[in-house]
């Protein structure tokens, strides 16, 4: 749309009498914002007439925490609203909904802390945060609102689980899981950060429990390969790629000397097999205890117990390697040499096979371990074929010539690395293998406040899904909702709810008492917004085809390997069963930076540095806060909050208001200089907007306004065309963007 046409259609008219009257008084944000907010509620500007192309701009919906929103939350919401208005003024019908991620640990922990039932505290918190979000003056469509705790919503969360169960993607397994002793529940690997619970920061331990799992590994290749087609920050794509961790190598079988057992290892460097001088097993390996001899048994059992109390993260980060010799040996299948079998907690049971062959000459960790425990080191790759005398560190160069490797001597390691898997397979003691760091998703939680898992346990039929026409399985009311810590959720104590009949055979059976994690609803909620009142389908195919997927998704980078990965998994599954015709949920992703307290410290109640928007709106107004949130720095970068900044923005708004007020009734002719300034603003701001440089859009508008103030003083006034450009959007009406929403509307 050309600049002239936008200005003609949208710019305020300076000669309008009511506008001149409103402008006559000094800028009073309370009066202005109250008036125009009511006007917008009565006359929405984002209406679907069925003729416009859609643009779906979505925020990551919030947890309804008791502390409400702080200015850091506001930043993402302001950014998304600016972008939504920009698209709206370019002729799109903008889908811009909001909802509540209200099940799970955050809401339940708050309820327990305050002694209030989570249903009550969650409803209260939602009401408070909704009020705060409405204060942003954003164009959210509240008719699309969703709440993950609404039975009409979680009916479909349960439906997805049933479909996954029928597809073989949901299964039950007893296994050692991450256990938070404070939250008293199991955690997925993605919920453990630096060895601690990502919610309460308690040190995570291990606990053997029967768990429901989702087979996200079945989608590992697609999740990894499809990253290439996403317009996402490279940082996020790399984080997901590293988390999935696909590697190519071989599985090799080592027979245990003197026993009818073998140990399978996974290695990405089968070319170095001649250099394998010892083996290390994870303490949790199924053979760990049985490999102990009479002489080593006590030390082995003590080491296994000690390792069980430590998190995987702690084990991987330890600089000091620990271990214990089992007393047993394995046979290197390539050269027949005996290699000692050790246990060490730097090997993880859930990666590869839980056992590794150790080539200390060419791996830093193995070298350190060998030096500490005086194990042999044999170099098998050398630069130019020359062996290093008295190695002081591992030779880890990727390329070199094979030495001390029998028939493989003289081969280039880079070539042998590719050929060795097939050679080993032909020799009969191994096979080619693609491996992944990604593990299946631990999906059940031993908590109350979550979606009941729709499974019935029948003594005869086994695990049976609740029939789809009987969904939702409602979360029952309880008196005691606190976690038990026993490995069972509080639901297990409700006999009248637990005891039921099997849908298959009609005999007495019991309901599953674990609940789903907080990520269950958020993995698909973005689909429901566009058809949130549909009682028969998760989303109709007609609306899915018309309004989905999400075009722009805005939220924090902290969800890179949690929500964002899970949402991609769910979307691919729903695509595969025909619910939607796309397999990626979010076409473009923008991660806004964090607003921190002083000295870059993250805002939190415990630090006492949370800045609430409520008082700022009262003192400075919504527009001043919105503008400062944009001005504070590049939107993708972290920024430190400074109260002096919003004070300066508020003073600037007053100067702008005065500029228009003083010139509203003047019939001043435009000059070459004002035309030049106006056109330059349009060009600069448009370019910056398209590049998402929102902070420089604001600074450019400030610069533009200051030039007009100086020019007004110099030549005695500013012409109407220039004022209309400025007044409409505070960043030029020809940009079709409305940064300072209520002030802009006031100036119409």
Tell what function each PLM region has.
Residues 26, 34-35, 39-43, 47, ...:
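Residue patterns forming the tRNA-binding/recognition surfaces of aminoacyl-tRNA synthetases
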Residues 51-61, 97-106, 146-153, 176-182, ...:
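Short, solvent-exposed turn/loop segments enriched in Gly/Ser/Thr/Pro and often Arg
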Residues 20, 64-95, 197, 328, ...:
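Conserved active-site neighborhood of enzyme catalytic/cofactor-binding cores
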Residues 80, 93, 285-384, 389-390, ...:
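Catalytic alpha/beta core of large soluble enzyme barrels
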Residues 24-60, 88-97, 121-128, 232, ...:
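Conserved oxyanion/phosphate-binding beta-strand-loop segments in alpha/beta enzyme cores
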Residues 46, 55-120, 127-128:
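N-terminal cofactor/phosphate-binding cores enriched in small/glycine residues
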Residues 1-3, 9, 15, 19-43, ...:
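Basic, alpha-helical terminal appendages of large translation-related enzymes
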Residues 40, 101, 164, 168, ...:
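Residue-level signal for inorganic ion chemistry
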């Amino acid at each position: 749309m050309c600049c002239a046409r936008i200005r003609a259609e949208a710019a305020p008219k300076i000669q309008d009498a009511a506008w001149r009257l409103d402008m006559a008084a000094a800028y009073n944000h309370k009066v202005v914002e109250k008036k125009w907010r009511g006007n917008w509620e009565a006359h929405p500007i984002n209406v679907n007439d069925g003729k416009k192309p859609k643009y779906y701009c979505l925020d990551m919906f919030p947890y309804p925490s008791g502390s409400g929103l702080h200015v850091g939350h506001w930043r993402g919401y302001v950014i998304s609203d600016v972008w939504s208005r920009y698209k709206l003024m370019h002729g799109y019908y903008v889908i811009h909904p909001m909802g509540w991620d209200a099940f799970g640990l955050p809401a339940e922990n708050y309820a327990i802390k305050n002694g209030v039932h989570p249903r009550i505290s969650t409803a209260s918190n939602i009401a408070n945060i909704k009020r705060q979000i409405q204060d942003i003056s954003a164009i959210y469509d509240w008719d699309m609102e969703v709440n993950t705790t609404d039975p009409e919503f979680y009916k479909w969360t349960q439906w997805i689980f049933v479909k996954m169960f029928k597809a073989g993607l949901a299964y039950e397994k007893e296994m050692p899981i991450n256990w938070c002793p404070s939250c008293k529940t199991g955690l997925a690997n993605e919920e453990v950060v630096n060895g601690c619970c990502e919610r309460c920061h308690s040190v995570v331990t291990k606990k053997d429990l029967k768990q429901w799992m989702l087979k996200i590994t079945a989608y590992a290749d697609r999740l990894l390969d499809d990253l290439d087609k996403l317009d996402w920050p490279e940082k996020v794509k790399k984080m997901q790629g590293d988390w999935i961790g696909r590697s190519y190598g071989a599985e090799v079988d080592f027979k245990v000397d003197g026993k009818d057992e073998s140990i399978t290892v996974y290695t990405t460097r089968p070319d170095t097999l001649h250099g394998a001088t010892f083996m290390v097993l994870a303490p949790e390996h199924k053979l760990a205890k049985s490999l102990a001899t009479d002489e080593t048994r006590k030390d082995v059992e003590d080491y296994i117990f000690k390792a069980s109390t430590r998190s995987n993260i702690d084990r991987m980060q330890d600089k000091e390697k620990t271990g214990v010799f089992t007393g047993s040996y394995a046979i290197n299948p390539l050269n027949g040499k005996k290699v000692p079998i050790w246990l060490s907690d730097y090997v993880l049971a859930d990666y590869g096979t839980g056992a590794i062959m150790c080539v200390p000459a060419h791996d830093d960790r193995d070298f350190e371990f060998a030096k500490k425990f005086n194990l042999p080191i044999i170099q098998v790759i050398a630069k130019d074929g020359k062996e290093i005398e008295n190695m002081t560190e591992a030779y880890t160069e990727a390329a070199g010539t094979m030495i001390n490797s029998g028939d493989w001597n003289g081969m280039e390691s880079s070539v042998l690395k590719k050929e060795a898997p097939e050679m080993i397979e032909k020799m009969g003691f191994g096979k080619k293998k693609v491996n992944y760091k990604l593990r299946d998703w631990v999906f059940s939680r031993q908590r109350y406040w979550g979606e009941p898992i729709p499974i019935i346990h029948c003594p005869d039929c086994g695990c049976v899904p609740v029939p789809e026409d009987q969904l939702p399985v409602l979360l029952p009311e309880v008196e005691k909702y606190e976690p038990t810590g026993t490995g069972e959720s509080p639901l297990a104590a409700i006999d009248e709810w637990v005891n039921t009949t099997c849908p298959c055979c009609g005999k007495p059976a019991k309901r599953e008492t674990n609940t789903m994690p907080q990520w269950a609803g958020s993995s698909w909620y973005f689909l429901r917004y566009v058809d949130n009142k549909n009682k028969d389908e998760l989303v109709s195919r007609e609306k899915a085809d018309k309004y989905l997927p999400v075009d722009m998704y805005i939220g924090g980078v902290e969800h890179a390997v949690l929500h964002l990965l899970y949402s991609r998994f769910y979307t691919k599954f729903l695509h595969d069963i025909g619910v939607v015709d796309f397999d990626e949920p979010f076409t473009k992703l923008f991660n806004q930076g964090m607003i921190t307290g002083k000295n870059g410290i993250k805002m939190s109640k415990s630090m006492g540095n949370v800045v609430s928007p409520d008082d700022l709106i009262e003192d400075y107004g919504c527009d001043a806060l919105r503008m400062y949130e944009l001005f504070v720095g590049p939107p993708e970068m972290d920024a430190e909050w400074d109260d002096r900044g919003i004070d300066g923005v508020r003073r600037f708004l007053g100067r702008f208001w005065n500029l228009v007020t003083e010139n509203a009734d003047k019939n001043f002719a435009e000059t070459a200089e004002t035309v030049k300034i106006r056109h330059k603003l349009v060009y600069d701001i448009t370019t910056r907007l398209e590049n998402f440089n929102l902070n420089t859009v604001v600074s450019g508008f400030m610069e533009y306004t200051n030039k007009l103030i100086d020019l007004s003083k110099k030549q005695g006034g500013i012409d109407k065309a220039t004022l209309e450009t400025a007044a409409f959007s505070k960043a030029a009406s020809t940009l079709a963007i409305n940064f300072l929403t209520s002030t802009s509307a006031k100036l119409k």
